[in-house]
Amino acid sequence: MKKKAIISACLLGLDCRYDGGNNYVGDEKIKKLKENYELIPVCPEAYGGLTTPRVPSEIAGDKVVSRLGVDVTHEFGKGADAALYLAKLFDCDCAILKANSPSCGSGTVYDGTFSGTLTEGYGVTARLLTENGIRVIDENEI
């Protein structure tokens, strides 16, 4: 029986990015992942009630704010809770998440200035999963 992993839906080609697009990682990476894992797609931002497309958001201090200055911390937290629920429901030991995202970034995220600058940190979902013992990697580590 294969292990199970949640994966950012945008990495599988689902159009759920903030701009309505996706971050498809390509057939070779997906094939490699499917050799070892049953993949469960998740989009924490959609699960949190945010629309697609949506105004970009970044982590600023202890909050997540949109480029328009709207506090969307609650929505990001709700989406993270949903992703954790699914990871536990399917007994996932790994999560493959979108690099640099305010939800899914693992190690680096955008710094909250909307200038494209990266800083050390974890997205809301990546942090919650890690705190609950689920290993998080990004698409660059496949």
Model region roles, listed by residue range:
Residues 1-6:
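Extreme N-terminal starter segment of soluble prokaryotic enzymes
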Residues 10, 98-101, 141:
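Short, well-ordered beta-to-alpha junction loops that form the rim of enzyme active sites
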Residues 13-19:
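Short N-terminal binding/cap micro-motifs at the start of the first secondary-structure element
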Residues 20-23, 110-116:
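Short glycine-enriched, charge-decorated loop/helix-capping segments at active-site entrances
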Residues 23-65:
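Short, surface-exposed acidic-centric catalytic microdomains
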Residues 25-39, 79-94:
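Short amphipathic alpha-helices and their capping/turn segments at secondary-structure boundaries
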Residues 47, 56-86, 117-142:
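Divalent-metal-activated hydrolytic enzyme cores
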Residues 98-113:
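Internal, conserved structured core segments that host functional sites
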